């Protein structure tokens, strides 16, 4: 029987950093079902006490991402008095950076959410990904920071949107054997192109499940091994001709594939867009 794990995220901003961290850590405990409760925009001592009182009542772990001066210390002391396990995430990092830079932190909650130029660049990149999804307009390949090529079910669209959230303009093109490859592809720097592939068994099983879900015969040409192998071979030959990076997305998450692409491009994985 799955046990419950209550995780309370306390923040003087939206609490996104604490939530992501809690989710990442909770994933390491598969025998527990995690329940997340956010307490955002905590700007008073009373709200700190109230959140910790509730955490005590529910036997929850409190994860705190305060940057407001004094809040983390106050919450830590109160949690200790109440017998609540509370983790102060931000203070050690702030102290570490302070030691290296000899600068005092601003202690401004939510500073990363300011509507600055980077924010609007990200919105523009998201719009670009939607506009040039699935090769809708070949001219997008010439304007893109990254061009994704791939057979079906290699996560081209979600990967495009994920990278767009890193302020990168991404266009993608689905590959079908003997289909016309737009001339624009050959004008793109191969270093900007990423070829996505997968394992034949993974692609076949996914297609079989899709046909079953549609109430159709799962053993059609769409999912037949010869057809799948033909598609993968077509893509492999094209990637060799282009001379681009190739990534097998089988058993890889969107985040893992994106990290490989960003490393290949020499880009910072987080691109300064993480939220708190």
Swiss-Prot record:
Keywords, ordered alphabetically: Kinase, Nucleotide-binding, Serine/threonine-protein kinase, Transferase
Species this protein is from: Lacticaseibacillus paracasei (strain ATCC 334 / BCRC 17002 / CCUG 31169 / CIP 107868 / KCTC 3260 / NRRL B-441)
Protein name from the UniProt record: Putative pyruvate, phosphate dikinase regulatory protein
InterPro entries: Kinase-pyrophosphorylase (IPR005177), P-loop_NTPase (IPR027417), PPDK_reg (IPR026565)
PANTHER family associated with the record: PYRUVATE, PHOSPHATE DIKINASE REGULATORY PROTEIN 1, CHLOROPLASTIC (PTHR31756:SF3)
The family this protein is said to belong to: Belongs to the pyruvate, phosphate/water dikinase regulatory protein family. PDRP subfamily.
Enzyme class: transferase
GO molecular function, one term: protein serine/threonine kinase activity
Binding annotation for ADP: 150-157
Reactions catalysed: N(tele)-phospho-L-histidyl/L-threonyl-[pyruvate, phosphate dikinase] + ADP = N(tele)-phospho-L-histidyl/O-phospho-L-threonyl-[pyruvate, phosphate dikinase] + AMP + H(+); N(tele)-phospho-L-histidyl/O-phospho-L-threonyl-[pyruvate, phosphate dikinase] + phosphate + H(+) = N(tele)-phospho-L-histidyl/L-threonyl-[pyruvate, phosphate dikinase] + diphosphate
Keyword S-adenosyl-L-methionine appears in the UniProt entry: no
HAMAP family in alphabetical order: PDRP
Function, as annotated: Bifunctional serine/threonine kinase and phosphorylase involved in the regulation of the pyruvate, phosphate dikinase (PPDK) by catalyzing its phosphorylation/dephosphorylation.
One protein family per Pfam: Kinase-PPPase
């Amino acid at each position: 029987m799955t046990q419950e794990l209550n995780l309370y995220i306390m923040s003087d901003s939206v609490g996104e950093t604490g939530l992501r961290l809690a989710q990442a850590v909770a994933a390491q405990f598969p025998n527990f079902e995690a329940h997340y409760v956010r307490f955002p925009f905590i700007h008073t001592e009373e709200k700190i006490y109230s959140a910790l009182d509730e955490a005590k009542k529910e036997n929850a772990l409190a994860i705190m991402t305060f940057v407001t001066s004094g809040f983390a210390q106050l919450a830590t002391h109160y949690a200790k008095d109440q017998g609540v396990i509370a983790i102060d995430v931000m203070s050690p990092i702030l102290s570490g950076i302070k030691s290296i830079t000899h600068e005092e932190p601003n202690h401004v909650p939510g500073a990363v959410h300011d509507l600055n130029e980077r924010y609007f660049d990200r919105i523009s990149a998201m719009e670009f990904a939607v506009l040039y999804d699935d090769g809708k307009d070949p001219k997008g390949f010439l304007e893109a920071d990254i061009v994704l090529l791939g057979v079906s079910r290699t996560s081209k669209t979600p990967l495009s949107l994920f990278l767009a959230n890193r302020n990168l303009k991404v266009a993608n093109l689905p590959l079908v054997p003997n289909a016309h490859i737009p001339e624009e592809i050959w004008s793109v720097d191969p270093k900007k192109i990423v070829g996505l592939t997968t394992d034949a068994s993974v692609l076949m099983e996914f297609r079989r499940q899709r046909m079953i879900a549609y109430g159709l015969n799962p053993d059609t040409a769409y999912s037949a091994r010869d057809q799948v192998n033909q598609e993968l071979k077509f893509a492999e030959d094209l990637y060799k001709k282009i001379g681009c990076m190739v990534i097998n997305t089988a058993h890889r998450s969107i985040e893992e594939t994106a990290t490989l692409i960003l490393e290949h491009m020499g880009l910072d994985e987080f691109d300064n867009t993480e939220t708190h």
